[in-house]
Regions:
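Primarily marks secretory-pathway-exposed extracellular/lumenal segments that are disulfide-
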Residues: 1-172
Length: 172
């Protein structure tokens, strides 16, 4: 394995990322594979921090799968510090398009994303630009949850009374 560290011989490790040219998130600069190659078209999460009185570092987010496993995170949830009035964009690899996922917004101070002003927002879009989650998160909370599915769920059996011709995933 090319990426390692040793307690007695500290060194700067090689850049990690996806080293498979066939993946959508291939990183030509990566020397070590981080195991996070994405072979599906990723969703895009756009975050705008607005004027946060210098406290945008409290903002964070996670995307969890149906089992509660974290598949992506950013901001304070990922030791990343946000700045006020700044746009951030993330590609999120979803492997099971028929599953239900949870976008969780965090405010570690507990006063919401729009403490000093309005305008902080999160928007999750699919590869075609369709909005799956859009919010301007208001004041006075420490966590907000938004459930979403990358595909339309419903009855895919054309002989059933509740058949949904637009459904891609059968919801049982």
């Amino acid at each position: 394995q090319c990426c390692w560290s040793q307690e007695y011989f500290p060194f700067s490790s090689s850049p990690e990322g996806c080293t498979d040219p066939a993946a959508n998130n291939y990183d030509a600069n990566a020397l070590c594979d981080d195991g996070l190659c994405c072979y599906t078209t990723p969703l895009t999460l756009d975050i705008f921090t607005a004027d946060w009185c210098g406290n945008a570092s409290y903002m964070g987010w996670e995307v969890q799968d149906a089992n509660g496993a974290i598949i992506a995170s950013g901001g304070s949830q990922n030791s990343e510090s946000y700045s006020d009035n700044t746009n951030y964009s993330y590609d999120i690899c979803i492997t099971d398009t028929c599953s239900i996922y949870n976008l969780i917004l965090y405010d570690n101070s507990g006063n919401g994303w729009n403490y000093c002003s309005s305008g902080a927002s999160a928007t999750l879009t699919d590869p075609n630009g369709n909005v799956m989650v859009s919010t301007t998160a208001n004041c006075c909370w420490s966590q907000k949850d938004y459930l979403f599915s990358p595909s339309i769920q419903g009855c895919t059996d054309p002989t059933a009374n509740n058949y949904d011709a637009t459904a891609v995933c059968d919801d049982g």
